[in-house]
Amino acid sequence: MSDWNPSLYLHFAAERSRPAVELLARVPLENIKYVADLGCGPGNSTALLHQRWPAARITGIDSSPAMIAEARSALPDCQFVEADIRNWQPEQALDLIFANASLQWLPDHYELFPHLVSLLNPQGVLAVQMPDNWLEPTHVLMREVAWEQNYPDRGREPLAGVHAYYDILSEAGCEVDIWRTTYYHQMPSHQAIIDWVTATGLRPWLQDLTESEQQLFLKRYHQMLEEQYPLQENGQILLAFPRLFIVARRME
């Protein structure tokens, strides 16, 4: 599990793209020239940006070679760069920085977010969506299984919170629109939940384990999911998935 798996990630493409669609709908920009898609993955969010602004120069940035290769294949009209978001520098100031489900993986948001704002043109927009599920059973159970099996904590840090992000971006000179939405995804089985998180949140926990260790981890994780996520009357499982949305417009 040394690299991201585009096919596994796209297995739930509709569910993963829906927050990007809703974030994009709140971006108050019309004719723009320069766009960056931070953590573009296989290009599903980049495609939405290209559809809305076909004449813009859109650059997707991702640290995964596999994801970048998939995105380049799918969107030859866009530019893609394999790079760390924290170190990447655009060639010119940007009109829009779009980050759908990527910045939660990076530390030091008190420094990162003002840095990203500094890359914008005046009236430019930073649009961010981040999973806010650190306290959801899916993620709590990852930590519990790791503790039971004596593995180190490899989960990401919790988000800073609504009030913190508002203050960070306001102090950076932005007008801020911020909201939180909980999606309830219909999952056919507990294994489907595992398939979902294996492509994202579960990766850090599994990537350094042997195959047998991964099997033991996932077996216990599956047992604990069954305890926390009951079946509905029709046999489906409702997976609650909170997400935090931010649209910050640089007013300088």
Curated annotation (Swiss-Prot):
EC number(s) for this protein?
Answer: 2.1.1.144
Q: Which UniProt keywords apply?
A: Cytoplasm, Methyltransferase, S-adenosyl-L-methionine, Transferase
One function term, GO molecular function aspect: trans-aconitate 2-methyltransferase activity
* The keyword Chloroplast is assigned to this record: no
Q: What is its main location?
A: cytoplasm
The record's similarity note reads: Belongs to the methyltransferase superfamily. Tam family.
What name does this protein carry? Trans-aconitate 2-methyltransferase
Native organism is: Escherichia coli O139:H28 (strain E24377A / ETEC)
Lineage, opening ranks: Bacteria, Pseudomonadati, Pseudomonadota, Gammaproteobacteria, Enterobacterales
